[in-house]
Amino acid sequence: MKFVDEATIEVIAGKGGNGVASFRREKFIPRGGPDGGDGGRGGSIFAVADRNINTLIDFRYARLHRAKNGENGRGSDQYGAAAPDITLRVPVGTVVHDADTGEVLFDLNRHGETVTLAAGGQGGMGNIHFKSSVNRAPRQWTPGKEGEQRRLRLELKVLADVGLLGLPNAGKSTLISRISNARPKIADYPFTTLHPNLGVVRTSPSRSFVVADIPGLIEGASEGAGLGHLFLRHLARTRVLLHLVDVSSPDPDADPIESAVENARAIVEELRRYDPELAEKPRWLVLNKLDMVPDPASVQQRFCEAFGWTGPVFCISGLNGEGTQELIWALQDYLDAEKRKEQITQDKADGSYVHEDPRFDTTRDAPPSGKD
């Protein structure tokens, strides 16, 4: 299925049905009084996040979504039927913008989360509501209200814990296929990856995290060169970025460190130009393709010194898996710690956080022994 992460749609909710002016007409009841019913509510349009959907391709072709109008009221105090609602299913991680103002209206980042895109119009009132002690035969009624109408831009930002960053052919797809069940296309030419790939890394039956692989960045990506800039938004929700650097060289006479450092600096600069906040995310350095390097320890030391890197660094081979287990467990421990911090922050905001004082321990007394 083709990956589509942007779409513009128009949603038109249904108009409410009109109320009616009607009077009771029965034999031997000459003055039956008003009995006009209300109009039905117009259909609303909702969006619900569905984890079983991973693309907005359905909205690329179905751009207009219109709900039906409510039925008009009738005599004998009969209310018009409400129109059925429309529910649009979108991927988890979809951001809904107002297409005209650019305002962010909704961010659906939880499975099952439901929002109202356009509310249906309220039905009009029948003349039964206008009866009073001084007006026993009202002829007033109100029309139904118009439903909401909006132009919306849907933008998908995939939900992942870890984002892979690097030049084309840095080994990102090889790494994600090594550590997860994702099977992206892998080949020895640039831009093999044409859309984001997600892989679930499971370290135990109860512990896992999600990795996102996007097309590689090239110099000038922030200005539209290559494909990577189209998908950098998918790294916005990640907790940590893995910057993959190819430290091998096809030319045995060339110094691979010099070109690797130059390429790594270009990636960081493109990241800063695209989004300074994204550039400030925690970033780990991953030196890849060490199976093609005679002295990995020396390469790591020389690269970090030349690059001026003091953060976390890992040396791996995505091809044979060397060093990947250490990377996986380090990521899992880091992500678990970050999630605990976020939970504590949320609990404090909700007022439900209970501080545990290590000076006080709770112990259970031994049960009393039976009588002799």
UniProtKB/Swiss-Prot annotation:
Any single GO BP term: ribosome biogenesis
EC numbers: 3.6.5.-
Region of interest (Disordered), ranges: 341-372
A cellular component annotation (GO) from this entry: cytoplasm
Domain Obg: 1-159
Its biological purpose: An essential GTPase which binds GTP, GDP and possibly (p)ppGpp with moderate affinity, with high nucleotide exchange rates and a fairly low GTP hydrolysis rate. Plays a role in control of the cell cycle, stress response, ribosome biogenesis and in those bacteria that undergo differentiation, in morphogenesis control.
The keyword Transferase is annotated on this UniProt entry: no
Residues that coordinate or bind GTP: 166-173, 191-195, 213-216, 288-291, 317-319
Compartment(s): Cytoplasm
A Pfam family matched in the record: MMR_HSR1
Family recorded in the similarity comment: Belongs to the TRAFAC class OBG-HflX-like GTPase superfamily. OBG GTPase family.
Cofactor(s) this protein requires: Mg(2+)
Iron-sulfur among keywords: no
Subunit and interaction comment: Monomer.
Organism: Bordetella avium (strain 197N)
Name the UniProt record assigns to this protein: GTPase Obg
Binding residues for Mg(2+): 173, 193
